Amino acid sequence: MLCETFLFHGYLILVFLSGSVAQFVSNESIKLHDILKPSDTHRLFDTLQYSVQEQYSDSHLSFDVSTIYNYSEKPISIGKLNRKYRDILYEGDMAISYKQLSLIVNGSTEYRKAAKPRLKDKKNLRNKRQAYLDQNYPATIWKNGVPFMFHESLSPSAKAAILKAIHFWYRETCIEFRPRTFQKEYLLFIGNDEGCWSTVGRDASQGKQVVSIGDGCEHFGVTSHELAHALGIFHEQSRYDRDESVTFNPRVVEKDLLFNFAKISPRQMSTYGLPYDVGSVMHYTPTEFSNFPSIPTLTTIDKNLQQTMGQLEGPSFIDVHIVNQHYQCQEKCATLAPCQNGGFTNSRNCKICKCPTGFGGVYCQLIAPSFSKFCGGVLNAEETPRRFDITIRQSTSVRSKSCIYHIKAPDGKKVIVEILKIDSKCIEGCYQDGLELKMKSDFRPVGYRFCCPESSRRRIMSESNLVPFIVYSKEENFSVSFEYSFVSSSARFDDGNIVEDVVIENPDGVFVSDSESSLLQKLGFRKSL
C-alpha cells in the first residue's frame, strides 16, 4: 500500500494513498470553472463597478510623489498569479458563491446610499460592529474543526506551505484542523489549476470547499492568506471604514476591474473594534490592479505607513486577533489573563497572553527577545539627539534575524526619530529586511516599515513616550542609522519643523502662546528642536 508522510502539529502523519481508512488524498479533477460560472458573477460585478464609480466620481488622478518607490524587485503578487481568472474571482482571489456575492452587492450598495447623509456621524457608524461576519454567523465558521484533504496534483513544496499555514492558524487560535475521513464538509486543497484562490468561510451548501495553491503560490504568506479566507476572513481594504486610512485612486485602474475596490458593508463584515491594519497579510499591495507599475492604486493617509502595505510574510497580530474574535476563542477561558500593551489571552493556555510585535513576557509587559544577545534592549531618549547604528549581516545558517528595542522617554514626553540612512533591498511591504517603528500609542497594528533608500532624512514624532522598534533581516544584509531624542507632549510639526507652544499663566491674567517669542527665551523657557 502506498503512503506518504507529512509533518502536522509537530507530529509525523502517515497518509495512506489507497484503501478506505482515510480519504486524505483526492484524485478528483476540479478547476475554478467547475465551481463558478462567469455568467453568474458578471452582472453582480457590473453593479459593484457602477457603485465604485459613483462613490469616487469626484476623484482625480492624485498621488503624492513620495509614495512612488524605486523597488529593487516586485514581490509575490496574488493578483498577478490569478490574472487568468480576473473576470470571475472577487477581489482577485476569492471564489464567492452567487448567493454570497448577491448579499455583498446588496449590502454594499444599500450601505453606501444610507451612509451618505450620515457622514458626520462616522464615529458612531464605525463603532457599531467591526469584524468579518454576516447574518448567517456563526453558521459560517468551522465550529467543529476543519477537515481537510490534499489533491494528488499538489507539489511537495505546496503541501509543506499549506501545512505550515494550518499549523500556524492552529497554534495562534482555538481552531482545530484534522485530515478528513468521512466528513461531508471539508477543505480540498488543489494544485491542478492556475493561481491562488479560495472560498470564504464555511458554506454547508457546498460540501467540499476548494482552495487552490497552484504554481507560484507555494509560500507561507500566500497559503496563510488563502486559508484565512477559508476561515471566513475578507481583505482588509474591503473594510467600510478604509477611507479613513487609505486613499483609493480609481483613475489608474481599468474600468471593468473597479469592482475589486468595493467596500463591504457592516451587514457582511465586522472588525470587532480592531484598528485598520495596513500591514495585514490580507491587505492589497499598493499597486494592485494598477495600469502603471509604479503608480499606486492605494496610498496611506499617514505617509509613513506606505511601505508597510502589501506584505506577504504572514499574518499580522491584528489578523490573528480578528480570527480569535471571529471564532470566539476567548470564551474557552474561564478567566482572562491581565494582558498589557494590547495583548489578549491565549485560548490554548489561558494563563498567558498573545502579544503585539515587539512585546513579550507572560502578560506582554516585557521587550520581546531578540535573535542574538548582542542586540536588543532599552534606549533612553534625551533632549539632545543620540545616534543609533545597526547592521545585520546574513552570514550564518540563521536566516530570520530580528533585534527588538524600546526607546523610552520620560512621562509626558514624545520621541523624535530622524532616519539618516537605510541600506536595504526595496520591496513592497518591506517584509524581507527592514526597520519597523511603532510610533502610535496603539501598539497592535504593524508600525511604520522602512526598507527603501528614499526613506532617508525622514523625521517622525511618536504619540507616546514609548517607541518599540524592530530591525529585521530575512534575505540580505540590512543597515540603518537614525537619531532619537524627546520633546514635550505639546510638540507638533509645522512645515517639517518641531514646534512647542508654551503657555505662561500669571496672576495678571496674561496668557502667551508663542513658540518663537523672545520673551519666553528671556524668561528662561527653552524650545526643543
Report residues per predicted region.
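Trp- and acidic/polar-enriched beta-sheet ligand-binding modules for extracellular glycan
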Residues: 187-189, 307, 447-450
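Metzincin-family zinc-dependent endopeptidase catalytic domain
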Residues: 114-144, 150-291, 400-402, 412
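Primarily auto-inhibitory N-terminal propeptides
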Residues: 3, 11, 16-152
